[in-house]
Amino acid sequence: MHKEMDMKILTCLVTMVWIFTVAEFAEGEQKGIMEAAGWKWDEKEMEYNSKSLFDYMDGAAELYLVYGFQRLTVRKFEKPSQPPITLELYEMDSSEDAYGLFSFDRQDEAAGIGQGSEFGGGLLRFWKGKYFASIYADGEGAEVESAVLAMGRATAELIQETGPEPKLVDLIPGKDFGLVDRSARYLKSHVLLNQRFFIAHQNILNLSRRTEAVLAQYSREKQKTNLLLIRYPGVKEARDAYQSFMGAYLPDAGGKDLVKTEDQKWTMARQRGEVVIVVFGAPTAADAETLLKATEERL
């Protein structure tokens, strides 16, 4: 009887310790970064939702909303005789959205922070799980840059969960076919697509939050070619989008999927099930065919 009571008491104590430990950790995570490399939080925190985000970044909020924006938390850090540092932490709808937001402007070298990162010009950008972070200073210098990186590492450590990259990104051909480093963009909007590669003012490919697209650049012998891979919710949606694209972008194709355009380069498009593949600006018809077939083989 005593042993049974002792076991119940022990179980209760272990449970209580576990509860308090989890609660303490969760509270610490909510507090976020307090200090990094001598820069201290000014104890002011700003939060924005999908409506108030426009107050913080008028004109740029649409980019974040397209990628399933949920919440933004902003903190500033100060150190005497040094420029302030701003930490922006965006909570997105999914890890795929966080990756997409990161990929849209990616251009600098990786910093080894989170699941994907870049650092250049004093700006650190990274993603981890469903979070995207942007950390920057209002000035330059080795000490400031070191602090920005330290703050990024500390922030990434607070984000406990990781998440998958979009599976569609793995379906594009790699460096064997000339894939340009850091050129793959994960897109959810024709407006964003046009900002990276203009196709048409109208949404002729029927892109939306229900579709996903990857735009990537390939280079061979200094010739640049763009590959666009789009997955639709179903075969009908893919077929409708393909027909819309061919009618608007390649009206003179005459039933063919390969056309020489006015710039003397080749564009090729094909639908395969729920996927549409388009190759833009290939130097030769054979190059367009090779890249498109390589993509088909990975589906």
Model-derived features: positions:
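Positively charged n-region of N-terminal signal peptides that target proteins for export
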Residues: 1-11
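Soluble, non-membrane globular domain cores that form compact, hydrophobic packing
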Residues: 11-299
